[in-house]
Amino acid sequence: MPYAKGEGPSVVIALGGNALGNTPQEQLELVKNTAKHIVDMVGDGVNVVVSHGNGPQVGMINNAFAYAAANDGKTPEMPFPEAGAMSQGYIGYQLSQAILNDLKARGIMRSTANVITQTLSLIHI
């Protein structure tokens, strides 16, 4: 029988951005595989928090907007903090969706939540 929230230990899993692949399709496949392992833990009663990096992904978003801005004249460049938020959003969405799909398939009634962080640029004068 699936465990209810709070019955087991709590763990934090840190996924580096490089662990998520180099293309959107590769990332989706790796996220689905990772979700299975996370749900294994949840099924064993573990409360899981997942933290992830986004270095390669934010770089790809930033480069794509820079390329579009340079080549079509209509697309503005994306500021780096906003590109970071975009990458956090889509990585969080893919992770949550994959985890929720696996939880549902196993009959485990748990939910997910995503938190987008903000990049602060401090200038010392």
Describe each model-derived feature in a short phrase.
Residues 1-51, 56, 60-67, 79:
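N-terminal glycine-/serine-/threonine-rich phosphate-binding loop
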Residues 13, 95, 112-114:
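Generic structural hydrophobic/aromatic packing signal, biased to beta-strands
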Residues 30-37, 87, 91, 95:
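General structural feature for long, well-ordered alpha-helical segments within catalytic domains
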Residues 41-47, 94-110:
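A structural motif corresponding to the C-terminal end of an alpha-helix
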Residues 58, 62, 99, 103, ...:
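Generic hydrophobic/packing signal
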Residues 72-90, 96-97, 101:
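A glycine-rich helix N-cap at a beta->alpha junction
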Residues 109-121:
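Short, glycine/charge-rich beta-strand/loop segments that flank catalytic centers
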Residues 123-125:
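Conserved small/polar residues in nucleotide/adenosyl-binding loops
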